[in-house]
Every structure is written in structure tokens, then in C-alpha cells.
Amino acid sequence: FQMDGMDGKLTLPFTDGEKWNAFYYRTRANVDYTHQFDQLDLNIAGNFGLSNFNFQPESVNSKQKFTSGDFHAGIHFIDETAPLHFNAETNLLMYERQHNMFNESEANTGIKETIIRTKGDVTGAIGDQQSITIALEMNNLLYSGYTKNVSTGDEYFKNYTTLLLNPYYELDNDDWKLHIGANVDLSFGFDKSFRISPDITAQYIFSDSYIVYAKATGGKQLNDFRRLENICPYGELPEANTTATLGYVQRPYDTYEQINGSIGFKASPYPGLWFNVFGGYQNLKNDLSYLGFDPSNIHSGSYLTFAQDNTDNLYLGGEISYDYKDILGISAKYTYHNWDSKTEEYLLAVKPVSEMSFNVRIHPISALNINLGYD
């Protein structure tokens, strides 16, 4: 169980010291149980979340509330001597956004999202060093509430299904670690599509402490309500493309990572010391971002709204770490990004140009751990 939040006066930018009585409260509750049988683990879990917060003055909505809950049940086959291994799980995820329009005069504008997620995989061993796996995931997304224009019947949130098939081959020996597969993504209904992206990783180890690696991955990123909250809780859903009645919103399209390819080199020239340098390229279709909007000629307020465009990302980085006898650990990482958008460059304003992290862990005695970090 966890509760955290803030309540205080913040100075608004671009004003003569105007204050905002801001608050943001989060509540999280979790329960997780695992029962171990002879050859199977049964896991049952549940989660609850509640976020209450307000917007700055003169926003189109004054406050917002997110309520979420989910239930998980899964089995995990643990007999390592068996020729086949499998995992299976089912999840029920529920989420409600309470306010979803540009006019709070209507009392009930909540939108509820329900996701039924089923996942499973089967792995067959080929000797001691090789295996083949077939993984499958299906998401059924259902919407209710303020999802359509009752006057015209136009529907802006449509139920749909996504299906992910991920077959791959793995090799693991003293010199090579290979993972070769593909992500096959299908969507039915809203955002109907068929897409394929790579799922490949290769590592070559030499002299026991030097590694050359390359990887190319991708796949669908569901822009469900949970992801929207993680990206920008203050963001409003995009306005529906309708001129009949203002104030209706629609769901963003899902983001698809067509490729995220990188190459790198890891080395440990001294015991306990590791460094890693890497570079790569990422291509995102319908990349989700957000921007500030002041629609003074249409609505009576300003707001942040989610928006999308295709983006490219070139990145370079490095990291270094040192561990001394489980007493001292130091690590640092830096990544530089060069983002590009062909049509909506203003959406890149919230993209990170660089990311840096630094962590120190001190374990002087068995009963004491000291951690210091910066991100």
C-alpha cells in the first residue's frame, strides 16, 4: 500500500507572480500471491490505483480523477528437465478518466476502458544450448461512457482487438548468445493494421570480458489510458474530428516501433570495472507526444493535448560501472538523442535531447545499505 502527493502554491510562468493552488494525490494498493506446486507456480495478483489532481487556472477542465484496477492470474511451468516449458496468464484491466471534454457543464463525461489481456508461450529445447519459443498475446479493448455523440450517433471510441505473435530461436553457448525472431502485430477494428518488426539480438563474447553486440527490436505500444497517464497526466485526449458538436474526444492511435536497432561494445579491462558504448536508430509510427494549446477562438481555456506524428531518433551513449567486493558500487550513464519529425516538429519540444543517470551504492555492514542516485 502506498500514498503520496503534493499540495501547495506554485508560481505560474509568464505571469506577474500569479499563484496556482496545486494538488496531486496518488493512492496505490497491491496484493500478490504465489502457490508453488511440484511442477507449476500459480500466481494471483490484484492492483488498485487512484489519482486526484487539479489543473492550473483558466484550463478547460479544473480537475481530473483517474481510477484503475486490475486482476491477474497465471501459471508458470518450472520443471527444467522437461522438453517443453510453458507460461499462461489472463488479465482484466479497468481504468476510468472522469473528465473528457472541453466544457464541464455536462456532469457525466467519464470514459471507461476495459482490457482483457491473454498471454502465453511455449518453449521447446533443442539440446542444452538451443531452444525455440512461440509467444502469443491478445488484447481486447472495450470502451463505455462518453464515447459517442448522442445527437448524431458518431462513435469516437470503438472496441478493438490486437494480436501479437512472437516466434524466436535462441542459442546460448560460451561464445555466442543469439535471439532471432519477429514481432507480427495485427489489429482488428479501430486502427486496423498488419505490421511486422524484427526481434533480433546477437552477442559475441571473447577473452571472457569483451562483448560485441547488436540488436534490432520493435513492436506495438498500446496507447491505452495507463500509458497516457505515464506520459502526461495533465494531457487531454485529442479532440474528435467533427464540426457537428464541439467537446468530443477520441482515442489516440497505437504507436508502432518499426525498428530500434543498435550496436555496442562492452568491456571489463579490470576486475569489477565495466564500460559500454553504443549507438543506434529508432523509427516510430504514430509516436505519442503532447503540446500546449490555447484555443481562445474556439474554447474558453488552455490545455495540454496529446498529438501524434512519425518520428526518427538517432542516439549515442555510454555507461560505466565499478563494483568492489559488494561494499561499493558506482555507475553512470549518458545518452544523446537527435530527434526528427518531417511534418510536426513542434511535437519534439518535449523529447529529451540527453539523458543522464548516476548511482552510488555503499554496503559497509550487512545491516546497512546507503544509496544515492541522480536521474
Regions found by a protein language model. Name each.
Residues 61, 105-108, 112-115, 121-123, ...:
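Beta-strand-dominated lipid-handling architectures at cellular/organellar boundaries
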Residues 36-41, 78-86, 125-131, 172-175, ...:
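Short loop/turn motifs that connect adjacent beta-strands in outer-membrane beta-barrel proteins
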Residues 177-375:
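Exposed, low-structure sequence patches enriched in small/polar residues
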Residues 1-7, 44-52, 88-96, 134-142, ...:
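Transmembrane beta-barrel strands of outer-membrane/channel proteins
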Residues 1, 29-35, 71-79, 118-124, ...:
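Residues on the lipid-exposed face of transmembrane beta-strands in outer-membrane beta-barrel proteins
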Residues 6-32, 36-117, 145, 151, ...:
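Flexible loop and strand-edge segments within Gram-negative outer membrane beta-barrel domains
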Residues 1-11, 131-146, 154-188, 326-327, ...:
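Surface-exposed extracellular loop regions of Gram-negative outer-membrane beta-barrel proteins
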